[in-house]
Every structure is written in C-alpha cells, then in structure tokens.
A protein has these predicted regions:
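Short proline/glycine- and polar residue-rich coil/turn motifs
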Residues: 52-61
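Short edge beta-strand/strand-turn motifs with a hydrophobic/aromatic core
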Residues: 63-71
C-alpha cells in the first residue's frame, strides 16, 4: 500500500538472463506497443528510454517504469486502470532467444486492488475484497502490506486474523465506511435501498 501523498511511484519488472552472467553490460530495447496500450506517456507514466542496460555480472535485472498517479482516479469503486503493453526487442549484444520478442502487460491504477494472496492464502475466508478490510489487516500487522505475498494463511496465525477481522469490522464501535459513506461489513457493503 502506498501513501496518498506519494504522487510518483516506480513499477519494477524483473528480467532474467539465460546462460552465464555477462562480464559486460548488455543493451536491450524496450518499446511501448501502442495498439495495446491505453496508458498515456507523460500523463500516466514517464517516457521510457528505448535502450535499457542489463548490468554486468547479473542473471536478473530490473526494468523501472515511473508511474504518475496525479491523473489517475483513486476511487476503488470506479476501478479505473490503464494498460501499458511493453515489448522487449533484441539488440546487437542482447538476443531474446524468441523470434517474435517478449511482451509484458503492466496495469496502472491508483487504488488499492486485491492483493495476490487474498483468496489463495485464506481460501475465501477473508470474504470479498475491500480496501477498508485490507487497511485494518495492515494496521494490525505490516506483513499484510505486501501486494504479492503474505506469510499468513489459514493454517497459521491467519486463522486468528480473519476471525478477529470478522468480529472487529461487524462491531458498530469499529464501523468503517467506503468512499461513498456506505458501511463495510465483513461479508457485504450496506447500500441504502434508494441507491
């Protein structure tokens, strides 16, 4: 989870080098696939240099994409996101080993989207995903803040967390509300009938 005050963020794409690590830096090319991309350069992300460097002595390196959050909606209910389709291209000293190149899709958004582990680690026991529920878990234990992995699951302390979350969020003394002022419960969001 990233603080609202941070307006520029960096997405990192890990690249793997096959074979032995090179003793010299290697140049590879990255291009934005325009017909598959909805994100706009200079609005949603900073320009990406075509030539990128794979550092010497490494089998992995990282392509960094600078994301601009100011022009993206932060409302979870709207789920506004932009697609950035990237393609690696070979260069004189960096062969991809795949004739048609390698593509990677990066989805850019400015809201808390469901972490990878939400369903898998807990087999649905955390109920539907809502950012307010995730914020509570993070407040209790920073281990929950990682989007990609969580050390807890239904077989360890995770069971205590989801049982406590259910009791906590359903208790009127701990009421939490979504961005439209609707009460968030463990298993639903209360929306007035007139809406």
């Amino acid at each position: 989870m990233i603080a609202d005050s941070i307006r520029i963020d960096t997405a990192r794409i890990v690249l793997h080098y096959s074979g032995n690590a090179s003793e010299q830096e290697r140049i590879y090319h990255v291009k934005v696939v325009q017909d598959s991309t909805t994100a706009e350069e200079g609005i949603h992300y900073q320009p990406i240099q075509k030539e990128q460097v794979f550092r010497p002595g490494r089998l992995t390196d990282t392509l960094k994409i600078v994301v601009l959050r100011d022009n993206m909606n932060s409302r979870f209910l709207d789920k506004e996101r932009y697609r950035l389709e990237l393609e690696l291209e070979p260069s004189e000293d960096f062969d991809l080993g795949i004739r048609q190149g390698i593509r990677k899709t990066l989805w850019l958004n400015n809201y808390m989207s469901e972490p990878v582990w939400w369903e898998g680690n807990f087999h649905g026991r955390l109920g539907f995903f809502h950012p307010e529920k995730w914020k509570i878990l993070i407040n209790w234990d920073k281990e929950f803040a990682n989007q990609d992995k969580c050390k807890y699951d239904q077989n360890n302390r995770g069971q205590d967390y989801y049982n406590t979350l259910r009791s906590y969020i359903n208790n009127d003394a701990n009421a939490v509300y979504d961005e439209d002022g609707h009460r968030v419960y463990f298993d639903h969001v209360e929306v007035p009938e007139e809406e």
